From Swiss-Prot:
InterPro entries: ATP_synth_B-like_membr_sf (IPR028987), ATP_synth_b/b'su_bac/chlpt (IPR002146), ATP_synth_F0_bsu_bac (IPR005864), ATP_synthase_B_chain (IPR050059). It comes from Acetivibrio thermocellus (strain ATCC 27405 / DSM 1237 / JCM 9322 / NBRC 103400 / NCIMB 10682 / NRRL B-4536 / VPI 7372). This is ATP synthase subunit b. The gene is atpF. Belongs to the ATPase B chain family. It is found in: Cell membrane. PANTHER family: ATP SYNTHASE SUBUNIT B', CHLOROPLASTIC. F(1)F(0) ATP synthase produces ATP from ADP in the presence of a proton or sodium gradient. F-type ATPases consist of two structural domains, F(1) containing the extramembraneous catalytic core and F(0) containing the membrane proton channel, linked together by a central stalk and a peripheral stalk. During catalysis, ATP synthesis in the catalytic domain of F(1) is coupled via a rotary mechanism of the central stalk subunits to proton translocation.
Length: 181
């Protein structure tokens, strides 16, 4: 039985080989394989290599673009930070200038008020002095008038030969004693 199986297997195998040999023609198979190998090298040289180089170049180009974009982003961020700090500095400087201007205006206001008060005080003092001077002049004129009137009255009453200078002294002494002026 084993032999029978073996014989039947070998017959089947022969049949399969015969069928296969009908489909496969060895020289055609060799030419086809050789053509495929040649086609592979031609395609590798003419198509795969340029495509591979194109893909590598594209990959490198994309990597460079990404790197440039990252650099540009970093530079933009740096510029943004720089401009923000400059803007903050300018704002602080403007605030400082405004504060200084406000302080100067306040000091100027206080100086003007102080000067106005001093000038008003000086004018008051000058007016008081002027009033005092005019009062003294008026009193002096009144005194002279009173002296003249008193002399006239005394000369009419006395009708003596007294000298005018002595009369004046006498009247002045009388007025001083009375407290007029």
């Amino acid at each position: 039985m084993l032999q029978e199986n073996f014989v039947s297997c070998s017959k089947e195998r022969e049949v399969q080989l015969a069928v296969l040999s009908e489909f496969i023609h060895i020289p055609t198979f060799i030419y086809t394989a050789l053509n495929l190998v040649i086609l592979y090298f031609i395609l590798k040289r003419l198509l795969f290599k340029p495509v591979w180089e194109f893909m590598e170049n594209r990959k490198n180009s994309i990597a460079e673009s990404m790197e440039k974009a990252e650099k540009g982003k970093a530079e933009a961020l740096e510029l943004k930070n720089k401009y923000e700090s400059e803007l903050n500095e300018a704002y602080a400087k403007a605030q400082k200038i405004l504060k200084e201007a406000e302080e100067k205006a306040k000091q100027e206001y206080e100086r003007i008020i102080r000067d106005a008060k001093n000038e008003a005080e000086a004018l008051k003092l000058k007016a008081k002095e002027e009033i005092e001077r005019e009062k003294n002049e008026a009193l002096k004129e009144i005194r002279n008038e009173v002296v003249s009137l008193a002399l006239e009255a005394a000369s009419k009453v006395l009708e003596a030969n007294m000298d005018t200078e002595e009369n004046r002294k006498l009247v002045n002494r009388f007025i001083d004693e009375q407290g007029v002026a």
